[in-house]
Design a protein with these regions (language model features):
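Acidic/His-rich active-site region of diverse nucleotide-sugar glycosyltransferases
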Residues: 1-56, 62, 71
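Glycine-rich phosphate/pyrophosphate-binding loop
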Residues: 16-30, 163-191
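A cytosolic small-molecule/anion-sensing beta-strand core signal
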Residues: 34, 66, 79
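An amphipathic alpha-helix/helix-turn recognition signal
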Residues: 60-63, 101
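Short active-site alpha-helical segment characteristic of glycosyltransferases
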Residues: 63-67, 83
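Active-site-adjacent helix/loop segment of glycosyltransferases
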Residues: 71, 75-164, 176-179
Length: 191
């Protein structure tokens, strides 16, 4: 995740995928692993209370990995693993519901787990997401733009409950080592 909670993967940033030239042939500690390709010990899964059922789909594995690290465990990337996964198979890449869940669940996850002042982060995030919603209006249509608006409405309805969860959460881990994936994407830096 970057500082603003936008996820990225090794070798992929948004829809830009690097050619595999072996640049990621290593074992490395990572912040999160895709739910389609990670293993977790049952004991650790139980300690974290597993996936948060409020998420249903999208970001639930990042939330789980974050909570796992807050308990002192590590998440590792093992390059020799082979995974075959149909991306966006549940809802489809162009689904406004996917857009809604991506933005809503990101807000849920950050509110629950972010180590710093969540309200300062949310203040900046609203502006960034507004710009994204305008971009989506132009590139994907009004349904995707409105999906972001609906994500915020749902989030604000749950905010009081999320703050209660946040106050009970052990927030040890700083979630980012990259300030903004957008800057990296523009600069074409390798993640």
């Amino acid at each position: 995740l970057d500082k603003f909670g936008y996820p990225y993967c090794r070798g992929r940033l948004y829809n830009s995928i690097e050619i595999d030239n072996g640049q990621y042939d290593d074992v490395k500690e990572i912040f999160w692993a895709c739910g389609a390709c990670f293993f977790i010990r049952k004991k650790v899964f139980d300690l974290t209370n597993g996936f948060d059922n409020k998420f249903w789909a999208h970001m639930e594995e990042i939330d789980l990995c974050w909570r796992t690290q807050n308990l002192g465990y590590k998440i590792k990337y093992i390059y020799k693993s082979k995974v075959y996964h149909q991306n966006a198979g549940t809802l489809g890449q162009n689904s406004p519901k996917k857009t809604y869940l991506d933005f809503r669940n990101q807000l849920y996850m950050l509110t629950k787990n972010y180590k710093g002042n969540i309200f300062i982060l949310l203040f900046f995030k609203v502006f960034v997401d507004f710009i994204i919603s305008v971009f989506f209006l132009i590139t994907r249509g009004i349904k995707h733009s409105l999906a972001i608006f609906h994500a915020y409405l749902s989030f604000y309805k749950q905010l009081k409950h999320l703050i209660i969860i946040r106050n009970r959460t052990n927030r040890k881990v700083i979630h980012y080592n990259t300030f903004s994936i957008v800057f990296n994407f523009i600069g074409l830096k390798r993640l």
